[in-house]
Curated annotation (Swiss-Prot):
It is found in: Cytoplasm, P-body. Belongs to the WD repeat EDC4 family. Gene3D superfamilies: conserved c-terminal region of ge- 1 (1.10.220.100), YVTN repeat-like/Quinoprotein amine dehydrogenase (2.130.10.10). The modification Phosphothreonine is found at residue 79. GO terms for molecular function: protein homodimerization activity. WD repeats lie at residues 219-259, 338-378, 381-427. Residues 755-784, 926-946, 1148-1168 form a coiled coil. This is Varicose-related protein. Residues 793-806, 848-859 have a biased composition (Basic and acidic residues). As a component of the decapping complex, may play a role in the degradation of mRNAs. InterPro entries: EDC4-like (IPR045152), EDC4_C (IPR049404), EDC4_C_sf (IPR044938), EDC4_WD40 (IPR032401), WD40/YVTN_repeat-like_dom_sf (IPR015943), WD40_repeat_dom_sf (IPR036322), WD40_rpt (IPR001680). One of its GO terms (cellular component) is P-body. One of its GO terms (biological process) is G protein-coupled receptor signaling pathway.
Length: 1340
C-alpha cells in the first residue's frame, strides 16, 4: 500500500529506529505484547513468584523483598459501608495491549497474522482460592510517597532513599511530528474500537484498534483543541477547534461490494460559533446520559447544544457549517452562563440533578444546574489565580459519592472539594456550598520559576481510583491514588507515584477497558509520535500499613520483625543449628510474643532488599543469624503454604488474637491490585496486641535483658494502647465500621479492658511473690513430658501442632468471634518454646490477649533442683487465678476457663504417679470448669444469634435501598435514552414522509402543468388524422356489399346480367366517390370543431386559472417584498436624516445656550463693575453718600441690581417647558443653590422618565457632578436627585464618552467619604456607588 507523497500521515509508514526516539527500558519484565511485537518486547507476562524452580539472579533480590511484604490481604485498609461486587479473576490475556496490535497491523500492511502466541516462557500460576494470574510487576519497583495531611507537598527534585522513577512500558502507535504547543485540552480521544487524534491542519485521524483501518475526517480549518467520545461503546465523537467550529461525528464501518471495509464519519452536527475573538482553548463535554446534549465553551461563554434541534431538516456539510452568532442564537443552542475570562475546562455529573462545572482564567469555578440561569455556587479555589482544571469524580461503587478536583495555574496545585453538607453528600438545592478537604502542591526546589518546571495535563480515572498528571517539562507522569473512603468527606489523595516517559506529553487520555485487568492504558500525543503507555495499577497503589518499614516513605514508623533466634536460645539450640527456612514443612505460630521481644528495623526503600539483614548480637558477643530470608534462601522460603480461610463478606475481618508470622502466608494479592476496587472483603485486619504476660512481668532482669538485645525499637513500636481482640469481642457481635476502627476502643470496651487490666495487675504481685515455685513447676513439667516421650522430635511436634491447629480453624469470620472458647491453638515454632510452656508461672494462656512469657527470660532463671511443694503451691495459685478470671464478664471468662481446662488436663497427665486423693480436687475443679464452659457457650451462642441478626437486617435494608436507587437510576437513564431515540426516529420518519409527499406533489404538478396537455393534444391530433381513412376503409366494403346485394336482388328478375353488371359498376364508382367525399367533409368540419372546443374548454377551465393564480401570488410577493424593502430603506434614510438633523439642532441649541449664558455672565459682570465704579465715585466725591443711599444713587443701584435675579428667568423657561435651556442656564452659573432650587421646582424623576429624554447627557453628567460637590447640605434630597440622574446617564454616548470616567471617579470619591451618613442615607449612598461602579466597568 503506497501512499501519496503529499500525505503527512501515510497508511503504511516505513519502520523507524525506536532507539533514536525512545529511551531503552532497563525493565527486566517488559509489558505483554502478544504475537505481533518485535523481539525486544517478546517477554513473559505471567510469571509465578512461588514456583519450585530456582529464580534467576536478576530478580532474586526482588522476590526476596516481595516475600517479606507480600501479605497484602492482611493490611488495615479503610472499609466501605456499601456492598462491593465480587471480582471474577480472568484468565491471562494473550494480547491486552491494543497499541501493540495497531503497530503490528500497520507494519504488516493491515494484514493480521493468525499467529499462535509463544508459550515456552509462560507458567501458569496457581493462586489460593482460585485466583487467576496477575501481571508481573516491573523489575524497577516504583517506590512512591505517601501523602499525609490536608496539605501535602511533593518536591519533584527531592528523592528520598530508595525512590525510583521507572520508565513506563511504551508501545508506539504511529510516528507523527505534532505541533509542540503547551496548551490545555484533549487532542486525543479513545474508546473501545477507535483512536482519534488531531493533526496540524485541523484534520482528525481515526484508527481502528482491532483492524488498523485508518481514515481522515476533514472539516476543521484550524487546530483541534478538544475532542471526546460520548461513551466507550458509542461511536459518537465531538470535536471543537480554534475557529469555533463544533462537529459531532458518527463513526461507522462498511464496504461496498467486494471493496475493503472503510471507516466513514457521518456529520451529525456541523456548527460554527461566532462572536468570540482570540479564543485559545475551546472545550467540549458530553452530557452524562443524553447523547443528544453537548456542552461547549467558546471564549467566556458556556453553551448547551441540543443536536436534535440544531439545523432540523437541513443537511450538514463540513465545508459550510451552520453559523450561530452569540448575539443571535439559533434554535437548539442556548447560553448556560458566562465567565469574566476564558473558560478552561468543563465537566458534568448527575445525582438527583445534573451539575456542570466550568473553570476559567478569571480564577473562578462555577457549578451550574439545568434550567437555572445563575450558578449554584461560585468558588475561587486558588486565591483568584487562573484555574486550569475542574473535574467531577464519581466513585464507581456509589453514584452519590461525588467530589470535585480543581487544578490551579499549570495544574501544579490540586485540590479536592466536597459538598459542605453532612459527610459531603450532594443534595438538590437552589444554592450549594463546597469546602476543600485536601491540597496537593507540586514544587521544584531547583527551578524557582514554576513555568519552566511544570506544565501538567490532568485526567481522572474514577474506575481505577487514579488522578494522572503529565508534566511536559519533565517528561514525567505523576499517578495520584484516590482513597474514596466511606463518604465524600473521607476521600483523599494518599499515594503518589512518579514515572518517566520518552518525550514530552502534549495531551493524553487514559482508559481502563477491562476492570478485571490491573492495567491502565495511557494514550499520549507527544512531540514526535503517538504512543501508548501501560500503567500497572499494582505500582500505583499505596503499600499496606503493616509493610511500611519495607517501603520508601517519609514516615517515621518502623516495622517490627520477630526474630527466630529469640526463641532458639531457650530451647538450647545454637545459632549454627538453625534449620533453613525452606526446610520448614508447615507454617508455625509463635506464642511467646511480647512487646519486649527482639525487633529489627530495616532501612526504608528497596535497597534493603539487596542487603542481608544485620545479625543480632547478644550480650555475649556471639552473632546470631536473622530469621529473615536471605538472598541465597530457597524459593520456598518466600512463599510457604498457609491454611485458606474463606472470608465472610460482611463481618469484621479481624483475626481473633492469633499471631501468624509473615512466612505463614502466601503472596495473595488483593482484588484491587487485579484492577478492581478495594472492598471491605479484600483485607484481614491483623491487630498486634500487647503480650500481657510480657507486660505484667515487671522483673528488672527481664527488662535489662530485652533492652540490651533490642536497641532499634522506636517509640512507635509500643502498641500498648491498642485494645486486644478478646476485649473487643466481649461485646455482642456487630459489623465493624471505619469510624470504629479509627476511633479505637468504645466506652463499654474501654471499661472492660480497664477491668481486665486491673485483674492482671493483681496477678503481678502473686507472680512476683512465688517466682521460685513457678520455676520449679516449669522444670518438673518439662521433665514429666520428656520422660513420657523419651525424646522430643521438634519437626514431628511442629507438624502435629500445625495440623491440629488447621483442623480447629473455623472457615468464616463469624467463627472467629468465639475462637477463645472453641479452639486451643498453641503450635510452637521449632525451638521457640519449651513444650508445656503454656503452664508457665501458673497463668493460663488466653488466646485473645496472647498472654505468654518470654521463654529466654524464664529459662535463664530455672534452678538446678526443685521440690514437689512448689507444684502444690503452684496449683493452689492456679486455682486462685481461675477464680479471679472467672469473675470477668463475657468471653474473657470463657477464654480463661478453656485455658484452665487445658492446664488442669496437663497437670493430670503429668502427675500420673500421685495418689488418687491428689487428683480428686482437680477432678472436681475440672467438672466445675466444664459446667461453666457449657453455660458460657450457650450464652455466647444466644448473644451471637441476637447480635448478628440485627446488623444483617440493617445491611440488607441498606443494600435494598442502594439497589433500588441504582435500578431507579438505570431505569430512568434507559427510559430517557429510549425516549430520545424514539423522538429522534420519529423526527427522522416525519421528515422523510414530509419530503416524500412534497416530492410527489411537485412531480404531479409538473406533469399536469407541463407534459399532460401537450401529450393529450398531440395524441388527439394524431388519432383524428388517422380516423378518417380507417373509417372509410372499414365502412366502404360494408356499404358496397349491402348495395350490391340489394341491387342484385332487385334487378335479378327483369334486367339481364349485362345491364346489371354495368349498373353495378357505375353505382359502385359513384357511390364510392360520394361517400368518401362526404365522410372527409364531415370530419373536417364537425370533428375538427369538436376537438378544438374540447381543448379550448380544458385550457380555460384548468390551465389558465392556475397560471393566473400563480402569477398573481408571485407578483403579490414581489410587490410586498419591494414595498417592505422600500419602506425599510425609507425609514432608515429618514432616521439617518433625523439623527443628523437632531445632532445639528442639538449642537445649535447648546451653542445658543452657551452664548446666552456668556451674555448673561457679561451683563452680570458689567453691572457689577458699574456698580463698583458708581460706589467708588460717590464715596470719593461726597462723604455723605451713606446718608443719601435712599436718594437717587440708591435708586440707581437698585435699578442696576434688579435684573440679576435668575429665578425669574428660570421660572419662565420652566413654564415654557424649555427644560434643557433652564438646566443649562442654572448649571452655567456654577451655583449649586440655584441648581438645587431648579431641581425642587420640577418633577425630576418624572422628567427623566420621559421618552425621549428632555435633558441631554452632558446636562445630566454636569448636574450629577454639581449635586455631588454640595452633598453635605440637604443630603437626603440631593441623594434622591442623584439617584434619578445616575440611572438616566448612558456612558456609551459619544457626547460624554471623554468626560464620563473622570467625573464618575470624582463623584465616587465624594460619596466614599460620606459612607457613614446617618440612617436611610447610607443605603442611598451605597446604591449610587454601586451604579457608578457598574458604569465605570462599562466605560472600559
Amino acid at each position: 500500500m503506497a501512499s501519496s507523497p503529499g500525505n503527512t500521515n501515510p497508511h503504511n509508514p516505513p519502520p523507524f529506529d525506536l532507539g533514536t526516539i525512545f529511551k531503552p527500558s532497563s525493565n527486566p519484565y517488559p509489558p505483554p505484547t502478544g504475537p505481533f511485537l518485535n523481539n525486544q518486547y517478546n517477554q513473559q507476562l505471567y510469571a509465578p513468584p512461588g514456583i519450585a524452580a530456582q529464580p534467576s539472579p536478576v530478580n532474586q533480590t526482588q522476590q526476596d523483598v516481595s516475600s517479606s511484604s507480600s501479605a497484602t490481604n492482611l493490611q488495615p485498609q479503610r472499609t466501605l459501608s456499601y456492598p462491593t461486587p465480587p471480582l471474577n479473576p480472568q484468565s491471562p490475556r494473550v494480547n491486552h495491549n491494543p497499541g501493540t496490535h495497531i503497530l503490528a497491523l500497520l507494519n504488516n500492511g493491515g494484514a493480521v497474522a493468525n499467529q499462535e502466541p509463544s508459550h515456552h516462557n509462560e507458567i501458569a500460576r496457581a493462586f489460593p482460592g482460585g485466583s487467576g494470574p496477575i501481571h508481573v510487576p516491573s523489575g524497577k519497583m516504583p517506590k512512591g510517597r505517601r501523602l499525609v495531611g490536608e496539605h501535602a507537598v511533593y518536591d519533584v527534585d527531592v528523592r528520598l532513599q530508595g525512590e525510583i522513577q521507572p520508565q513506563l512500558e511504551v508501545t508506539p502507535i504511529t510516528k507523527y511530528g505534532s505541533d509542540p504547543q503547551l496548551v490545555l485540552g484533549r487532542q486525543i480521544a479513545v474508546n473501545k474500537v477507535y483512536i482519534c487524534y488531531g493533526l496540524k491542519g485541523g484534520s482528525i485521524r481515526v484508527l481502528n484498534i482491532n483492524t488498523a483501518l485508518r481514515s481522515l475526517f476533514r472539516g476543521h480549518s484550524q487546530r483541534v483543541t478538544d475532542m471526546a467520545f460520548f461513551a466507550e461503546d458509542v461511536h459518537l465523537l465531538a470535536s471543537v477547534s480554534l475557529d469555533g467550529k463544533v462537529f459531532v461525528w458518527k463513526i461507522s464501518e462498511g464496504s461496498e461490494g467486494d471493496e475493503q471495509s472503510q471507516i466513514t464519519g457521518k456529520i451529525v452536527v456541523a456548527l460554527q460559533i461566532l462572536g468570540e475573538e482570540d479564543t485559545k482553548h475551546p472545550r467540549v463535554c458530553w452530557h452524562c446520559h443524553k447523547q443528544e446534549i453537548l456542552v461547549v465553551s467558546i471564549g467566556k461563554h458556556v453553551l448547551r447544544i441540543d443536536t436534535t434541534k440544531v439545523g432540523r431538516g437541513e443537511v450538514f456539510s463540513a465545508e459550510a457549517p451552520l453559523q450561530c452568532h452569540l448575539d443571535k442564537l439559533i434554535d437548539g443552542v442556548q447560553i448556560v452562563g458566562k465567565h469574566d475570562g476564558e473558560v478552561t475546562d468543563l465537566s458534568m455529573c448527575q445525582w438527583m440533578t445534573t451539575r456542570l462545572v466550568s473553570s476559567s482564567v478569571d480564577g473562578t469555578v462555577k457549578i451550574w444546574q439545568d434550567r437555572k440561569t445563575q450558578p449554584l455556587v461560585v468558588l475561587r479555589p486558588h486565591d483568584g489565580l487562573p484555574v486550569n482544571s475542574a473535574i467531577f469524580v464519581t466513585s464507581p461503587e456509589r453514584p452519590d459519592h461525588i467530589i470535585l478536583i480543581t487544578g490551579g495555574p499549570l495544574n501544579r496545585e490540586i485540590k479536592i472539594w466536597v459538598s459542605a453538607g453532612e459527610e459531603g453528600w450532594l443534595l438538590p438545592a437552589d444554592t450549594e456550598s463546597w469546602r476543600c478537604t485536601q491540597t496537593l502542591d507540586l514544587k521544584s526546589s531547583t527551578e524557582p520559576q514554576a513555568e519552566k518546571a511544570f506544565f501538567n495535563q490532568v485526567i481522572a480515572l474514577s474506575e481505577a481510583g487514579l488522578l494522572l498528571l503529565a508534566n511536559a517539562r519533565r517528561n514525567a507522569i505523576y499517578s495520584v491514588h484516590l482513597d474514596y473512603g466511606s463518604s465524600p468527606v473521607e476521600t483523599l489523595m494518599d499515594y503518589l507515584s512518579e514515572f518517566t516517559v520518552t518525550m514530552p506529553i502534549l495531551s493524553f487520555i487514559g482508559t481502563n477497558d477491562h476492570p478485571e485487568e490491573p492495567f491502565v492504558k495511557v494514550y499520549c500525543v507527544q512531540t514526535l509520535a503517538i504512543q501508548q503507555y501501560t500503567l500497572d495499577l499494582f505500582l500505583c497503589m499505596p503499600p499496606p500499613r503493616e509493610n511500611v518499614g519495607f517501603e520508601k516513605s517519609d514516615s517515621t514508623v518502623s516495622r517490627e520483625a520477630n526474630l527466630v533466634e529469640s526463641t532458639l536460645e531457650t530451647s538450647g539450640m545454637k545459632p549454627t543449628e538453625l534449620p533453613s527456612v525452606g526446610s520448614v514443612p508447615k507454617p508455625s505460630i509463635l506464642v511467646n510474643r511480647s512487646e519486649n521481644a527482639n525487633m529489627l528495623s530495616f532501612p526504608a526503600g528497596p535497597a534493603s532488599a539487596g542487603i542481608t539483614p544485620p545479625a543480632i548480637v547478644p550480650p555475649n558477643g556471639e552473632p546470631k543469624t536473622s530469621g529473615m530470608p536471605s538472598e541465597t534462601s530457597d524459593v520456598d522460603s518466600a512463599y510457604a503454604p498457609s491454611p485458606q480461610l474463606p472470608l465472610s463478606p460482611r463481618l469484621s475481618s479481624k483475626l481473633s488474637g492469633y499471631h501468624t508470622p509473615v512466612e505463614a502466608f502466601e503472596q495473595v494479592l488483593p482484588h484491587h491490585k487485579l484492577g478492581g476496587k478495594t472492598s471491605s472483603a479484600d483485607y484481614f485486619y491483623v491487630r498486634q496486641t500487647d503480650d500481657v504476660g510480657g507486660r505484667n512481668l515487671d522483673v528488672s532482669s527481664v527488662e535489662e535483658n530485652c533492652r540490651s538485645k533490642d536497641t532499634n525499637v522506636t517509640p512507635d513500636d509500643d502498641v500498648s494502647g491498642i485494645r486486644s481482640p478478646s476485649a473487643f469481642f466481649k461485646q455482642p457481635t456487630h459489623l465493624v465500621t471505619p469510624s470504629e476502627i479509627l476511633m479505637g476502643v468504645s466506652s463499654t470496651e474501654a471499661s472492660i479492658t480497664t477491668e481486665d487490666k486491673r485483674d492482671r495487675d493483681a496477678n503481678i504481685e502473686e507472680v512476683n511473690n512465688d517466682a521460685r515455685g513457678l520455676e520449679v513447676e516449669l522444670k518438673e513439667v518439662g521433665e514429666a513430658q520428656t520422660s513420657q516421650n523419651g525424646e522430643i522430635n521438634y519437626h514431628e511436634t511442629t507438624e502435629n501442632h500445625t495440623s491440629e491447629s488447621r483442623e480447629n480453624i473455623f472457615c468464616s469470620q463469624a467463627s472467629n468471634l468465639s475462637t477463645e472458647m472453641a479452639r486451643d491453638r498453641h503450635p510452637i515454632t521449632e525451638g521457640s518454646a519449651i513444650p508445656g510452656d503454656s503452664m508457665a508461672y501458673g497463668q493460663p494462656l488466653q488466646a485473645g490477649d496472647e498472654r505468654g512469657l518470654d521463654s529466654r527470660d524464664v529459662s535463664a532463671k530455672l534452678p538446678e533442683s526443685g521440690s514437689s511443694s512448689g507444684l502444690v503451691a503452684t496449683n493452689s495459685k492456679g486455682k486462685k487465678q481461675k477464680a479471679k478470671n472467672s469473675q470477668g464478664p463475657g468471653l474473657s471468662s470463657t477464654s480463661s476457663n478453656v485455658a484452665n481446662l487445658a492446664d488442669s488436663f496437663n497437670e493430670q497427665s503429668q502427675s500420673l504417679n500421685h495418689p488418687m486423693a491428689d487428683l480428686l480436687p482437680q477432678l472436681l475443679a475440672l467438672q466445675e470448669t466444664m459446667t461453666q464452659v457449657m453455660a458460657s457457650q450457650k450464652e455466647m451462642q444466644r448473644q451471637l444469634s441476637n447480635a448478628v441478626t440485627g446488623p444483617i437486617v440493617k445491611e440488607g435494608k441498606k443494600l435494598e435501598v442502594a439497589l433500588g436507587r441504582m435500578i431507579e437510576k438505570s431505569s430512568k437513564s434507559n427510559a430517557d435514552a429510549l425516549w430520545a431515540h424514539f423522538q429522534e426516529e420519529a423526527v427522522k420518519n416525519e421528515k422523510a414522509l414530509r419530503d416524500h409527499g412534497q416530492q410527489i406533489m411537485n412531480e404531479t404538478t409538473n406533469f399536469t402543468s407541463k407534459e399532460l396537455n401537450a401529450m393529450f393534444e398531440k395524441t388527439m391530433k394524431k388519432e383524428f388524422a388517422s380516423v378518417g381513412p380507417t373509417l372509410a376503409r372499414v365502412v366502404t366494403p360494408v356499404i358496397e356489399k349491402t348495395v350490391s346485394s340489394a341491387i342484385t336482388e332487385s334487378f335479378q328478375r327483369g334486367i339481364g346480367d349485362k345491364a346489371v353488371n354495368q349498373l353495378e359498376k357505375s353505382v359502385n364508382s359513384k357511390l364510392e366517390t360520394t361517400v368518401a367525399r362526404q365522410i372527409q367533409a364531415q370530419f373536417q368540419t364537425s370533428g375538427r370543431q369538436v376537438l378544438q372546443e374540447g381543448l379550448r374548454s380544458s385550457m380555460e377551465s384548468s390551465v389558465i386559472p392556475s397560471f393566473e393564480r400563480s402569477c398573481k401570488t408571485m407578483f403579490e410577493q414581489v410587490d410586498s417584498t419591494l414595498q417592505k424593502g422600500i419602506g425599510k430603506h425609507t425609514s432608515a434614510t429618514q432616521q439617518r436624516i433625523d439623527s443628523g438633523q437632531s445632532q445639528l439642532a442639538h449642537t445649535l441649541r447648546e451653542t445658543i445656550s452657551s452664548a446666552s449664558s456668556v451674555t448673561q455672565a457679561l451683563n452680570r459682570e458689567l453691572a457689577e463693575s458699574q456698580r463698583n465704579r458708581l460706589a467708588l465715585t460717590a464715596a470719593g466725591s461726597n462723604p455723605l453718600v451713606t446718608q443719601l443711599s435712599n436718594g437717587p444713587l440708591g435708586a440707581l443701584l437698585e435699578k442696576v441690581e434688579a435684573p440679576m435675579d435668575p429665578t425669574t428667568e428660570l421660572s419662565r423657561l420652566i413654564s415654557e417647558r424649555k427644560y434643557e435651556e433652564s438646566f443649562t442656564s442654572a448649571l452655567q452659573r456654577s451655583d449649586v443653590s440655584i441648581v438645587s432650587w431648579l431641581c425642587s421646582q420640577v418633577d425630576l424623576r418624572g422628567l427623566l422618565a420621559m421618552n425621549p429624554l428632555p435633558l441631554s447627557q452632558g446636562v445630566l453628567l454636569s448636574l450629577l457632578q454639581q449635586l455631588a460637590c454640595d452633598i453635605s447640605t440637604d443630603t437626603s434630597r440631593k441623594l434622591g436627585w442623584m439617584t434619578d440622574v445616575v440611572t438616566a446617564i448612558n456612558p456609551s454616548d459619544q457626547m460624554i464618552a471623554v468626560h464620563a470616567r473622570p467625573i464618575f471617579e470624582q463623584v465616587y470619591q465624594i460619596l466614599h467619604h460620606h459612607r457613614n451618613a446617618p440612617g436611610s442615607d447610607v443605603s442611598a449612598v451605597r446604591l449610587i456607588m454601586h451604579v457608578i461602579n457598574s458604569l465605570l466597568m462599562s466605560c472600559k
